[in-house]
Every structure is written in structure tokens, then in C-alpha cells.
Amino acid sequence: MDEILVDAAQPEPALRVAEMNAFYGERQVLRDVAFEAQRGSVTAVIGPSGCGKSTLLACLNRTIEDVPGARWRGDVLLRGEETACLSADELRARVGLVMQQPTPFPFSIERNIAYGLRFRGVRNRRRLREAAETYLDMVGLLGEIDGDVRRSALELSGGQQQRLCIARALALEPDVLLLDEPCSALDVASSATVEAAIGELKKCCAVVVVTHNLAQARRIADSVVCMDAGRVVWQGGCAELFEEKRESVLAPLYGSELL
């Protein structure tokens, strides 16, 4: 596999992907995918249904390795470090993934956050409580529950559960946080709170969001990766895509769906 060339004059991206290919049995679903994501930014991955967006996230987090008959290959670097030598658990601590419509663990809000903190070796109960409050506040949830972290996570609304699962992933302090269609099952008000939380997340890591919603991508993203048939067909700044490349890039992908 070709060596990834790095420009020493440029800041090292939080995530660098090159030559990523993925297969389900004999069917190839990703073809030589390459892109970068910077800390302090939100990268939206968009494209028609079935183009490989969710498979891309599964490869980055290696959950694809749990799928019978699936395989992948490619280069994934975190802050310039090759990840091939990392165990699945080590990688997943550094590349957090919140799936579409995630479900919190069926116990207290605090224990949901403590799950990730204990993975990092935090055992002191006071530190667990303080850290849980910090991450819940980061996603705008602490005030909504009046600071009662002992409440059952299953009592929360759909949007609140979504943000709790994001906070749980943040507790591992990942280099990159992957979000798969984070607002697909939420109402307008809940979607707005999740989008606001995403804007805060990029302060502590690179955020990669898969979304079918072009309006949402335009609201939250700093950069965009456009996919079609398993390939990256365009990538660049969000403003450039929606203001200059709308007809040349988006129209062929979305057709009549593009308003």
C-alpha cells in the first residue's frame, strides 16, 4: 500500500484516511475513499442512500469487523499515528461512534457516563460525579435534568437520550467522534438541541457526521465529503459546496430532492 505523504507545513489532522475499501462478501461498497478531518471542525459526510456513508463509519471504528462476511482495508491515521497496531478496544476509545437511534444503558444517567470513565481508569465516586456533570453540561443536558444524574436514562426523551449517548462517547476523550444520522428520528426541537451540542463538541475533538439532510449539513458543517457509489466524488468547504458547487456536485447526486 502506498505511503501516505504528509506536508510538514500543515497541521496534522485528527483523522486521515487513505485507500479505504470495504466489501460485504463479494460486493464492494467502498472504493479508495480518502479524506481528512481536523480537530475543531465538523465534517459532514453526505450522499444518496446506499452510497457507503454508514459503512465508512463502521470501518473507521472497526465495527465492520463484527459483521459476518465483511472485510475492509485502508490506512487510518489519528494525529499522524498509524492505527493498524491498535487493538479494537484501543481504537474505539480514540474513535468514538454514536449509532443511529442509540439506546442508553438501562440504569442511571450517571452510570451511563461512568461506563466510559471507568474504561479510562476513573474509580473515585466524586470524580465520576463531577466528570459526568461536565460531559452532560457539554451536550446541554445537565440543566434540562436539573442536575439529577441519578434519574433513569430510560426516562429521557429521544433527543435527550441521543445527547446522553454522545456524552457517554465523549467520556473516553476520543480524538474523533463519529455520529451516524444523529437527528434522523427526532422532532424539530430535539434536532435543534442536538445540532447545538454538535457545535460544542468540536472544541474537544474532530467530529464526523453522516447525514442525509442537506439543510442540516449546511447548518453544522465546516467541511463536507460527498459520496456516491462508494467513492468520494467531492470534498471541500461547506460554503464552497452550497454556494459555488451546488449545480455541479449536488444536483447530480440528489436530482429532484435538491430544492
Regions flagged by a language model, labelled:
Residues 75-90:
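ABC ATPase NBD Q-loop/coupling interface
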